[in-house]
Regions:
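Extracellular or lumenal secretory-pathway regions
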Residues: 16-117, 122, 136, 167-275
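Bacterial Sec-dependent N-terminal signal peptides
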Residues: 1-20
Length: 275
């Protein structure tokens, strides 16, 4: 792994964003052997840290040119913000509405004397148990930044790599650069389709997700009823011609929800009932 990182900037200049790009590999289904790969952004701003999908920023640039609202969201990718030097995270989750959940996430690290050198950078090992999973991190003390991807922070240096012991998740730093001004994410991270995220508790969100599981195609059913059979109506790329078809589609959707239930924080997985 070749890192493209500038270590000559010991601190963030006023009103600037220092951006780190991480390669994120993960399994949505823990029983699968396939790993999905996406690039994620860690923005270190003067007063706040943000973590979100790289494609959101790319799409936002196009939206601004076209004067479009953001309607891009990937439910399998984490998105969060936190104040500088804080463990208080605000996570953004899209169900039928964009919600935000505030959590306090302190992480207890165990520092190791093990080190390794990658692309000229000296990395030190640390381990932790977080979110019901065991993690191994490699960090660099030359960068006086106690940050890292997702909620992982608090080490005496920037996290370059972190992975889960069962191979379900990993983050690897691949690039870093400085932006001239603080990068504004208010149109695509903290909002969806022009609407700001609504604050909700973890307990209430879990209940809503269980309710959604019980009737996952509710909105599509209403749309089909209102269409009165006019034109073609597709769900999951399947043409629907009668309400009875929704029974089979509902079962397929529920099966997918059960299978794709492998969150970063395993102890927060929704316990969907088997049909």
């Amino acid at each position: 792994m070749k890192y493209i990182i500038f270590l000559v900037l010991p601190f963030l200049c006023s009103a600037q964003t220092h951006r780190f790009i991480y390669e994120y590999q993960f399994k949505t289904d823990s029983l699968s052997t396939e790993l999905r790969k996406e690039n994620m952004i860690l923005d270190l701003n003067p007063e706040e840290t943000k973590f979100y999908a790289y494609e959101y920023a790319a799409n936002d640039s196009l939206n601004k040119i076209r004067n479009f609202k953001n309607i891009l969201w990937d439910e399998e990718l984490p998105a969060l913000t936190r104040p500088k030097n804080s463990n208080r995270n605000t996570s953004y989750i899209l169900t039928n509405t964009l919600f935000k959940v505030e959590t306090e996430d302190p992480i207890k690290w165990n520092l190791s004397s093990d080190t390794k050198k990658v692309s000229g950078y000296n990395l030190q090992k640390a381990t932790t148990t977080f979110g019901g999973r065991n993690w191994t991190a490699w960090f660099n003390t030359e960068l006086n930044l106690n940050e890292g991807p997702y909620k992982f922070r608090g080490l005496p240096g920037l996290i370059f790599e972190i992975s889960e012991d069962k191979g379900n998740f990993s983050f690897k730093l691949v690039k870093s650069y400085q932006l001239k001004s603080t990068y504004d994410t208010s149109d695509f991270l903290e909002a969806f389709d022009g609407k700001k995220a609504l604050l909700i508790s973890e307990k209430t969100l879990a209940k809503q997700q269980l309710d959604l599981y019980g009737n996952p195609l509710k909105d599509f059913k209403e749309m089909f009823k209102n269409s009165k059979g006019e034109g073609k109506f597709k769900v999951m790329n399947i043409e629907v011609k009668s309400m009875e078809q929704f029974n089979e589609l509902t079962l397929k959707t529920q099966e997918r929800m059960r299978r794709h239930n492998n969150p970063l924080e395993l102890d927060k997985a929704i316990h969907y009932p088997a049909n």
